[in-house]
Each structure stands twice: as C-alpha cells, then as structure tokens.
C-alpha cells in the first residue's frame, strides 16, 4: 500500500471492510468476474491487485496461465541449472523470489530446494526467476 491503495486481497478486504467471500473483482485480461476459487488461488499465489481507471482487478487462473506462457514466449532472457542460481543471484536460495513458470505461484522453500537438488532448470523471464512448482512439474 505504498501509494495508499491496497495491493493484496487481504489489504483490499481490510481497507473496504468487505468479507473475502463477498468480493466481486473482474479479471484484468478477460473481463469476467473472478470466481471465489480463483480469488483464493490469486491470494495463495501472493499476487497483487491492479488499479486501473478507478477500478481494482484480479486475474482468473486461466488468464494467469496464458499470461505466464505469453511472458515465457516473449520475455525469456536465459536459463540456468538451479544449482548455479545462488551464485548468479548472489543470494541464498531462500531469499530468491521464484514464481512458477506455468501458474505464477510463489515457490516455497521446499520447492526451491527441490529445484536445486533435482538439478532442475530455472528461467529468467522479465527479470524474474521462474521454475516449476510442485503442482505444475507433475503436469510437465
């Protein structure tokens, strides 16, 4: 909330005194109402709301998946083996922000360590590190 506007769903609910279960937000991409299940996933993925034209927007899961694919195809910078990530980023693995390349979920420490010890690849896309989360790696 650096500019006074809520950035997360919980900030939004607190600021406007609304229950999460009563939220009605539109998807920034497809303009459909984001259903409760997708809002819950949006929250769990630690994504930020978009404020545009005096309205707040979230993103549905399908558009998130398509957005991740679009960014992968258009903003790919490089890929490295996860074992080299700490050296390249000059940070410990627990301090590196890594999102899932497919669903954009923020990876937890177990998933990051799994990337490291399984000799998986990490991808730099739009200046942000990406790898596979535990759900999407199984679908690969």
From Swiss-Prot:
The keyword Membrane does not apply. It comes from the Viruses. Its main location: host cell. GO terms for molecular function: DNA binding; zinc ion binding. GO terms for cellular component: host cell cytoplasm; host cell nucleus. GO terms for biological process: DNA-templated transcription; regulation of DNA-templated transcription; symbiont-mediated perturbation of host apoptosis; symbiont-mediated perturbation of host ubiquitin-like protein modification; symbiont-mediated suppression of host innate immune response; symbiont-mediated suppression of host type I interferon-mediated signaling pathway. The keyword Transcription applies. Forms homodimers. Interacts with ubiquitin-protein ligase UBE3A/E6-AP; this interaction stimulates UBE3A ubiquitin activity. Interacts with host BAK1. Plays a major role in the induction and maintenance of cellular transformation. E6 associates with host UBE3A/E6-AP ubiquitin-protein ligase and modulates its activity. Protects host keratinocytes from apoptosis by mediating the degradation of host BAK1. May also inhibit host immune response. This is Protein E6. The gene is E6.
